[in-house]
Amino acid sequence: MVRILLFCLALLVAGPAFAIKPLAQYWARPDTLGLKYQSLTLTTSDRVHLAAWLVEPSAGAPDQHTTIVVAGGDSGNMASNIFTAATLAGAGYRVLLFDYRGFGHSDAFAINQNYLYYPEFATDARAALAEARRRSPSQRVGLMGFSMGSLVGSEAAATTHCDVLVTIAYPASPQHVVAHYQRIRPERPIILPAEAATYSQVAPKVNCPWLFIAGTDDQATTLADTLAVAHAASRRQRREVLPVPGDHPQSMGAFSEDNLAPRCLAALRRLLASPAAAGKG
């Protein structure tokens, strides 16, 4: 019952999709769920300091020799992802959670909430990947992005050494996302950064194995757009699409809801076992 109440609170704190609404205060920390962790401070290439939590695999779990960096969505802070961290830690993964600039306890950053995303968030994801690699140079390092986090996470994976990429509710076409929300809530503009004009060039540059998890009823980040990106990959690029029931918010529970997490963990293990990702671990 306590876990259910905490999960409901996490959803409430996270707020609506595609509205950049960072929170400074953590509603919980990993040890709220009994997870062993340490607090870190990361430094980006442009000298911004980011708050982070490094969560250890749960006692008795089989060591996967893999660190998963989690890039969260566009609201709340890294506390919103502690249930995902608990699932991954319980399966034997080390997990690095971090706050984007302007989120949580990271350095301040001026944010216009009408933006879909900021390119600087990709810089933050790169810093998290680099720190995970520095701490475990002989192990695999992957990135898991949720919604906006999958957009900036894919940019990071395209330009930084990454052994596996997992995206949940992936905005394959930022322009389609904007068009969708302009139809259903025309009173509120959504602004794309200039860099979004060339975002379609990012996916072909992601050479690590990539797992797409997409909601079958997601009207914002559609399964059709996700399949188009996956099918456009070259034969050398390993891509797997896992459809899950539900809309955009429901798909975000891929690694925290009991009815979805086992399938998603199994897909992650398959991808890590592929030759492209199995060189370490």
Where are these regions (language model features)?
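Hydrolase active-site cap/lid region
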Residues: 151-196, 202, 253
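The serine-hydrolase catalytic nucleophile loop
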Residues: 74-87, 100, 224
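Conserved alpha/beta-hydrolase
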Residues: 88-108
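C-terminal catalytic histidine-bearing segment of alpha/beta-hydrolase fold enzymes
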Residues: 237-281
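Alpha/beta-hydrolase active-site loop
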Residues: 114-135
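Short beta-strand/loop motif that positions the catalytic acidic residue
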Residues: 206, 212-214, 218
